[in-house]
Amino acid sequence: ILAAKLIKDQGIEVIGICFKSYFFNEENAKRMCKQIDMPLEVVDFSEEHFEMVKDPKHGRGKNMNPCIDCHAMMMRYSGELLKKFDADFIITGEVLNQRPMSQNRQALNTVKKESGFSEKILRPLCALNLEPTEMELNGLVDREKLLKISGRSRKTQMELAEKWNIVDYPSPAGGCKLTEPGYAIRLSDLLDNQETVAKDEIEVLKYGRHMRISPKNKVIVARNGEEWKEIVKFKKEDDILVTSKNSTGAPVILRGEFNKEDLETAARICGRYCKEKDSDAVEINYEKNGEI
């Protein structure tokens, strides 16, 4: 948003591009664009993005986040939109060395190269640390009005936000679930144990505890009533619902191929999290397709 404002202040029309996937959405972008009166185009690249997440060419960060491959994909999609909007170039808010893996000089160059639009990418916030682009050399953009931010500190960015009265902006991670350790563990487990994964199976990872009983099955346990309202939306026809007969404790979903031993394990997990957990015994119900 700061990069967009910087270019807008040169009298250049700017259109926001936001990407939507299984792991992040457009809500932050919508709020930010309103603050600088910038139109927004939302691009849903969920399927292609997910295929990349499974096997990123340039590896991952601390968790499941393939930032270099992700940025390159975003730049490619943005480049393909240039003609649609009769636009001249792409700007991004990247800052040299702000992130050790994905925003070092080599990574920034990799993103440009693999995007297929390397000559059309401008990084206004750190442009003075980089070689001039064709947009600067031909006078389309005034290089002297661009910035030289580098490093991990966000002090300069926060000062700019205050100066421009931009008060609603996201945390540095930007709302990407792939950067969250707990979510990353659940996604990694899913990919390690299933050859094919459906959208609903990815969505439900955002909620509850996911416990692998065997390579062929797992249980999902809600932490509270609000989580259960979300989890139950993704319940499959073949799932087993495991509940305590005499309490309103946490329901458990058993998913996958299972045997009697797995059912008993799911029952013990249900007993562990229900309100009767301190009792000598907990009576358990198994429900499938509405039948107990």
Residue ranges with predicted function:
Residues 1-163:
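ATP-dependent adenylation/nucleotidyltransferase module used to activate substrates
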Residues 118-292:
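AMP-forming adenylation/ATP pyrophosphatase catalytic core
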